[in-house]
Regions:
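Mature catalytic domains of secreted/periplasmic carbohydrate-active enzymes
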Residues: 1-438
Length: 438
């Protein structure tokens, strides 16, 4: 990774943990249309139920989130321990949370009228939380959107659509200059892949307007239609964003530790927008959410956990409870997350390693009956001492060269816990390990 990209993505290593907000007209029906409940992703309901755009956009007349309070949203995120939030400025349906002058399908033309996006940007920034913009290139509401470009008429229409999209992106960058990142979606269709030049143009345009802004890999396509990574295998954009509701394997996929990457996950199995019935799919527990966060950080990545607000502007009780649970754990254990990176140590069944400087953190999710946690260090690395984050020492016994048993606490904490290892290593150990991966 070149130094220019590394400087732009320094926030990755510092922040590590973010929140996703999927909010749009789809929150009003909440997965149900004309009496039928669709188990698929609620933000795709227009597609599942085959609702014409004109009929779908009639939902704008009902958009009036009277319980919305951006300051409460921001405080909840702060208490949860997130360092940044990604907000859906516009999802595939085409409804804009800001008063765009390039379309009628905006919050300005609803009973609510006010600039929701602007309220959120200010509230989150006031809490010290960076704001990132999700933006769907695909726009079901626009007459010039095309899934493919096959005729001269398609080409002319799609050219107009790209100009429209340019204008909306420039508008967002101008109205909200504190935005730190653009996270693009809806770029997988042939129409975009045949216009890879445009994705490169958008990246340049935004970086000229907002020096330091980062762009996800999902935007980009090269001249051959390859996405995320070009035909030569080089990452496009500033960080890889292909890990959606999945994570790289901690043993087989170590290549990801060589670049910045970010995963995003839902709490139900596949619901990004608000769905009224979470019983239709498995819902992750707070510990399962925590494990995915730690898993990502242990491989040098970030994790973004999604919340789908209700149409009235409030969050469902399950999301509020999840935020409290995650926040309580982060308050005690956040030092093993923020600013941490891949440790380069052999994965063990009890959990994950993260690293910050000469400190290696053991984040324990699975407790062995032996009460001993096996640690295997790279050649040239010694464990000097071990302690819980409250400062209590933990016994360490060297059982073989570069192998140790680390005792569990006398009393199990009843939740995932962290042991900090202070280490000493020969010069160049980490660099040699990373070089071996290239």
């Amino acid at each position: 990774m070149n130094e220019e990209i590394r400087q732009r993505t320094k926030w990755f290593m510092e922040d590590r943990f973010g929140m996703f907000i999927h909010w749009g007209l789809y929150a009003i029906p909440g997965g149900e249309w004309n009496g039928k409940v669709y188990p698929g992703a609620a933000e795709w309901l227009k597609s599942w139920a085959k609702v014409p755009s004109g009929e779908w956009l009639e939902l704008m007349k009902q958009w009036n989130p009277t319980k919305f309070d951006a300051r409460k949203w921001a405080k909840m995120a702060k208490e949860m321990g997130v360092r940044y939030v990604k907000i859906t400025t516009k999802h595939h349906e085409g409804f804009c949370l800001w008063p765009s002058k390039y379309t009628e399908n905006t919050v300005a033309n609803t009973p609510y009228k006010k600039d929701l996006l602007g309220e959120m940007v200010k509230a989150y920034n006031d809490e010290g939380i960076d704001v990132h913009f999700y933006f769907s290139v695909m726009d079901w509401s626009h007459p010039d959107w095309r899934y493919d470009v096959k005729t001269p008429e398609d080409s002319a229409a799609f050219s107009r659509f790209l100009t429209f999209t340019d204008n909306q992106l420039k508008e967002l960058a101008t109205l909200y200059p504190t935005v730190k990142d653009f996270w693009f979606d809806g770029t997988w269709d042939a129409s975009i892949k045949k216009n890879g030049w445009w994705t490169a143009h958008v990246e340049r345009m935004l970086k000229e307007m907002l020096p330091g802004v980062t762009i996800n890999s999902r935007l980009r396509a090269d001249d051959y239609g390859k996405r995320h990574f070009d035909s030569n295998g080089h990452l496009m954009g500033d960080y890889e964003s292909g890990y959606e509701r999945r994570l790289p394997d901690p043993v087989k996929d170590l290549k990801v530790t060589l670049w910045d990457w970010e995963a995003c996950m839902t709490v139900p199995e596949n619901q990004w927008g608000y769905h009224k019935d979470w019983s239709l799919s498995y819902v992750k527990t707070p510990v399962e959410v925590l494990e995915r966060i730690v898993h990502a950080v242990s491989m040098g990545g970030n994790m973004v956990v999604n919340f789908g607000p209700q149409a009235d502007g409030d969050f469902r009780s399950e999301e509020k409870e999840l935020a409290k649970s995650i926040g309580a754990w982060m308050k005690k254990n956040g030092q093993c997350i923020y600013g941490c990176d891949y440790a380069g140590w052999e994965k063990q069944p009890w959990g994950y390693y993260t690293r910050k400087g000469s400190d290696v953190y053991m984040v324990v999710f699975n407790c062995p009956y032996s009460k001993h946690l096996t640690v295997k260090t790279p050649k040239g690395t010694q464990v000097v001492k071990a302690a819980l984050l409250n400062g209590k020492s933990v016994k360490v016994v060297e059982t073989a060269r570069n192998e140790y048993n680390v005792d569990m606490p006398a009393q199990e904490p009843g939740e995932p816990f962290v042991i900090k290892l202070q280490i000493k290593e020969a010069a160049g150990v980490v660099d040699k390990y990373r070089d071996a991966l290239t």
